[in-house]
A protein has these predicted regions:
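Membrane metalloprotein/metal-transporter helix-bundle signature
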Residues: 2-197
Length: 197
């Protein structure tokens, strides 16, 4: 028992003490930090996966244009954040984007392509701004931006994969899974929204 206790204490001493939060100080890699930023927050993960599911459900050209719009406009939002441009209520806007995207998935909103691209583009501004404004001071803006854009595209692909897997289920089951997943995401978005005030 004492040997196990010693091993546990030594292991605890080797654990890094830095918190894994959105904002970092000290030496950071621009690309790695940017890549991890969307993956480290449930708000970003939910929204970006929902964009992929929404794009899959729309089908056709929306399958690639909706995620591409999100990533492109998010880069603009990131630039605004890095430049210090203030956008009011960014965290509340991000929470609302989850609520809205969840509802769009749950209710199978069949928006015209331009409307769908406009909606996800609007949401992307806020997500990008959050990424950009939380970039570490010593990170390369270009590398950081490439990192968070790549991670976002990966999350969109996961969402498309989830959409494909759910769509492969038999008729009533697949629709029910979409409704439940979208509804739960909307509830999560609403809960995050309440925390902002």
């Amino acid at each position: 028992m004492t040997r196990l206790l010693r091993l546990a204490l030594i292991s605890l001493c080797l654990v890094p003490t830095a918190a894994s939060a959105h904002v970092g100080i000290g030496g950071t890699g621009g690309f790695a930090h940017g890549f991890m930023h969307p993956l480290s927050g449930l708000d970003h993960q939910l929204a970006m996966i929902l964009v992929g599911i929404f794009a899959y459900r729309l089908g056709g050209r929306a399958l690639w244009l909706v995620p591409l719009t999100f990533v492109s406009v998010m880069a603009l939002g990131g630039f605004l954040g890095v430049m210090g441009v203030t956008i009011p209520f960014v965290e509340a806007d991000i929470a609302f984007s989850i609520l809205a995207l969840g509802a769009m998935v749950a209710f199978n909103v069949r928006a015209p392509l331009a409307v769908a691209m406009g909606a996800v583009g609007l949401f992307a501004i806020f997500h990008g701004h959050a990424h950009g404004s939380e970039m570490p001071m010593d990170a390369s803006g270009f590398e950081y931006g490439i990192g968070f854009m790549l991670a976002t595209a990966l999350l969109h692909c996961i969402g498309i994969g989830v959409g494909m897997a759910t769509g492969a289920l038999s008729r009533p089951w697949g629709d029910n899974v979409y409704r439940c997943a979208g509804g739960l995401a909307s509830i999560a978005g609403f809960a995050l929204l309440l925390r902002c005030f």
